[in-house]
């Protein structure tokens, strides 16, 4: 049965993925597509509703993104947000102008609660504004349903044509009743049924993969991260021993992580698949010897990983399908925007040519990260794996400033394990977006017992974030930081100083390199 679909048309807004996530949280399936999506393509998709995103442009700008005016004649409900609201007004005969005063931040908006859009919403509600232009006059046939002292048309509707628009951002958490507004749009206005559920997605995807693969052989590069692990388990459910997972242990994983992956997926694990572990630590350490520049380290680690995987793939022989853990943000950022779970090798950029296979399978291609975790739980994957901390592809190679050596890897592994253990013991691990220890390239003088030391400094990082695009330094309790510090300097040989990184993103990145 075909599911309900809401389209998010992207006009360059920074919150486009967030809008889609909020709609999906309402149990309605949603896709993000570029603003130049044709009316014919939209008709083929048969959406229940359309949302126009915000964007940095003015509708009067020379190169500002516009949509085909025919979209308003499709009879499909449309919800314009920020730039999307101005675009709707501009294209339908309203007047958009530069606001006398820019509105930015939390703003009290008076709304008409008789509108379907604001059903169950307070008549005066806090919303997040971020605009310099505004709708000065609504188009003919539209009714003003929201205003502020600065913005005379903070919200408008043409109920007969199911066209709605707001100047603020209902998708951000600062708009206190924004989720309710989006829910009203998809249910009260679009008539969606709420048929996007993870159990049905998992069941449907398993059946699709099973039908596609038949008796074919499937190969998966397993990193032990959330995406590749969920993809592997899903494929295992579909085709069992026809799946071979290759796990390349490059020696740059967190403490005991390689053994944990083997315990879960290996011969004594709970999944019906073939598992190959390649212990390639020495190869990677040799390649990284003397290399200090971060991008060079990344490149070496990536290229060596490909070589190792290639060698193992050749031993396996011909495979019919290659599994990738692509998730929906990757699809959006690539500009592809299509929703097929399985697509041919030649239609995908950047795939390895050294593996002889017919097609690629991307079972998580439709899911956001939080949905991947839900799928993992639905598949019965242990929580410790499903909620594992984000970990970069180059691993500890970019959490060690400067040259990577086996000695340095052990130092950062031990320090990081202590840090993660104490965060969990304090019961705050679910409150922090990401946390880890990094080894600086700095040595300093210290005193241990009666002896002078000259050892490394460890940097602790912890951030809170909803999207990893921006982040704030986490306000960790001093008691926890003190305990972590005491344990690291006493238990980790080669460290005599611990520092806490208080920098947000921007200006810093979350990782050190």
From Swiss-Prot:
InterPro entries: Class_I_gatase-like, GATASE, GMP_synth_C, GMP_synth_GATase, GMP_synthase, GMPS_ATP_PPase_dom, Rossmann-like_a/b/a_fold. The keyword Manganese does not apply. The keyword Lyase does not apply. Residues 196-388 form the GMPS ATP-PPase domain. The active site is at residues 82, 169, 171. One of its GO terms (molecular function) is ATP binding. Its EC number is 6.3.5.2. It comes from the Bacteria. Signal peptide: none annotated. One of its GO terms (cellular component) is cytosol. It catalyses: XMP + L-glutamine + ATP + H2O = GMP + L-glutamate + AMP + diphosphate + 2 H(+). Residues 5-195 form the Glutamine amidotransferase type-1 domain. ATP binds at residues 223-229. It holds the Pfam family GATase. Pathway: Purine metabolism; GMP biosynthesis; GMP from XMP (L-Gln route): step 1/1. Keywords: ATP-binding, Glutamine amidotransferase, GMP biosynthesis, Ligase, Nucleotide-binding, Purine biosynthesis. Catalyzes the synthesis of GMP from XMP. Homodimer. This is GMP synthase [glutamine-hydrolyzing]. It comes from Clostridium botulinum (strain Alaska E43 / Type E3). The gene is guaA.
């Amino acid at each position: 049965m075909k599911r309900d679909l809401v389209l998010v048309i992207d006009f360059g807004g920074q919150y486009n993925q967030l809008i889609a996530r909020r709609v999906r949280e309402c149990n309605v399936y949603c896709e993000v597509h570029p603003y130049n999506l044709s009316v014919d393509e939209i008709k083929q998709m048969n959406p229940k509703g359309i949302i126009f995103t915000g964007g940095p442009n003015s509708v009067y700008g020379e190169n500002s993104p516009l949509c085909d005016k025919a979209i308003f004649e499709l009879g499909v409900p449309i919800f314009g947000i920020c730039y999307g609201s101005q675009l709707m007004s501009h294209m339908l005969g309203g007047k958009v102008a530069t606001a006398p005063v820019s509105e930015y931040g939390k703003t009290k908006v008076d709304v008409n609660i008789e509108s379907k859009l604001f059903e169950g919403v307070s008549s005066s509600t806090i919303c997040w504004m971020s605009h310099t232009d505004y709708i000065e006059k609504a188009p003919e046939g539209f009714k003003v349903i929201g205003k502020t002292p600065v913005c005379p048309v903070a919200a408008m509707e043409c109920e007969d044509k199911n066209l709605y628009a707001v100047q603020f951002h209902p998708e951000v958490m600062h708009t206190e009743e924004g989720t309710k507004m989006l829910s009203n749009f998809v249910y009260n206005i679009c008539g969606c049924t709420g048929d996007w559920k993870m159990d049905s997605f998992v069941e449907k995807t398993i059946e699709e993969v099973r039908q596609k693969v038949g008796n074919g052989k499937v190969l998966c590069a397993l990193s032990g991260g959330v995406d590749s692990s969920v993809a592997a388990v899903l494929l295992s459910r579909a085709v069992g021993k026809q799946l071979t997972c290759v796990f390349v242990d490059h020696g740059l994983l967190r403490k005991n992580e390689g053994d944990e992956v083997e315990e879960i997926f290996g011969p004594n694990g709970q999944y019906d698949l073939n598992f190959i572990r390649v212990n390639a630590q020495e190869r990677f350490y040799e390649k990284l010897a003397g290399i200090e520049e971060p991008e060079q380290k990344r490149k070496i680690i990536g290229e060596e990983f490909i070589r190792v995987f290639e060698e193992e793939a050749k031993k396996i022989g011909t495979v019919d399908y290659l599994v990738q853990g692509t998730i929906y943000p990757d699809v959006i950022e690539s500009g592809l925007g299509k929703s097929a779970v399985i697509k041919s090798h030649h239609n995908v950029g950047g795939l390895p040519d050294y593996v002889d296979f017919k097609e690629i399978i991307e079972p998580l291609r439709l899911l956001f990260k939080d949905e991947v975790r839900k799928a993992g739980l639905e598949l019965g994957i242990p929580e410790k794996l499903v909620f594992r901390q984000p970990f970069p592809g180059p691993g500890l190679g970019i959490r060690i400033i400067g040259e990577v050596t086996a000695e340095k890897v052990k130092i950062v592994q031990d320090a990081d394990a202590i840090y993660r253990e104490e965060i969990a013991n304090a019961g705050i691990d679910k409150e922090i977006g990401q946390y880890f220890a990094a080894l600086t390239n700095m040595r300093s003088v210290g005193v241990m017992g009666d002896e002078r030391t000259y050892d490394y400094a460890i940097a602790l990082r912890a951030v809170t974030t909803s999207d990893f695009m921006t982040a704030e330094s986490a306000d960790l309790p001093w008691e926890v930081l003190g305990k972590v510090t005491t344990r690291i300097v006493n238990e980790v040989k080669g460290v005599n100083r611990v520092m806490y990184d208080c920098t947000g993103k921007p200006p810093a990145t979350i990782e050190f390199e």
